[in-house]
UniProtKB/Swiss-Prot annotation:
CDD domains: LIM1_FHL1, LIM2_FHL1, LIM3_FHL1. One of its GO terms (biological process) is cell differentiation. PANTHER family: FOUR AND A HALF LIM DOMAINS PROTEIN 1 (PTHR47029:SF2). Changing residue 123 to Y: In RBMX1A; the mutant protein initiates aggregation of the FHL1 protein causing reducing bodies formation; dominant-negative effect. Keywords: Acetylation, Cytoplasm, Developmental protein, Differentiation, Disease variant, Emery-Dreifuss muscular dystrophy, Isopeptide bond, LIM domain, Metal-binding, Nucleus, Repeat, Ubl conjugation, Zinc, Zinc-finger. A zinc finger (C4-type) spans 7-31. It holds the Pfam family LIM. It comes from Homo sapiens. This is Four and a half LIM domains protein 1. GO terms for cellular component: cytoplasm; cytosol; focal adhesion; nucleus; plasma membrane.
Amino acid sequence: MAEKFDCHYCRDPLQGKKYVQKDGHHCCLKCFDKFCANTCVECRKPIGADSKEVHYKNRFWHDTCFRCAKCLHPLANETFVAKDNKILCNKCTTREDSPKCKGCFKAIVAGDQNVEYKGTVWHKDCFTCSNCKQVIGTGSFFPKGEDFYCVTCHETKFAKHCVKCNKAITSGGITYQDQPWHADCFVCVTCSKKLAGQRFTAVEDQYYCVDCYKNFVAKKCAGCKNPITGKRTVSRVSHPVSKARKPPVCHGKRLPLTLFPSANLRGRHPGGERTCPSWVVVLYRKNRSLAAPRGPGLVKAPVWWPMKDNPGTTTASTAKNAP
């Protein structure tokens, strides 16, 4: 008698029918799907006997459900990478490890043009001006906190303007008396020499280098005829000049004492006037008369006149007998 060839679960005869052998038992397709089939981790449906099955680390998928978790590309016949319980294709794996654009928050993959600033990256077209929204790309820009501005918008909103040319100062600016200047605009009004870091003199809102001030602006000293200049950068300079005085005159001859370089100017006439050596006057203390003038060739030195009657001072007789 022939052995019965029946389904292990429903006992239906399997002769002439499709069946599946599972764990040493034979079962019809219907019972296989019901009792033996693995469940797809993607769609949560049984993987029937007539379906293709993909498995990885005790997990099972329909071949059509085995796709990249990012781009949904089918991976049944391709290489893949499992990361954080996700199945990824090679391209998405690269993107997963790639930096994210600060503008669109998408991955920057190999071949994408990008801009990097202080550890942050953007797609080239995502790096735009915070004001006008124009693409900055790889052009010049100015950072302001978390914002970035193109050159034009920065000049309009933030840049100082030169007091001379009224153009924006983007680099190389200087400040003088709380006013901003381009370094190329702050120059000597005469020779156009740059004055930044140099000594200069300001005269009525005009600025001169040291040489031009000496040659063209500075007043000349009445005594030495040299220019009156300051020793530091000031708006006004001064020169210590005494008021002009008439030269002292000899009481006797009424001649300027400058004609007598050897004159001792401390010798004085009793009236307080200075006397040249040729006209030394001798004062007699008692009668306060004047002695006759001595000849120019006979005078050797002026006489010192005592200002007070102190003991031991020169008397009239000693002055008279002086050689």
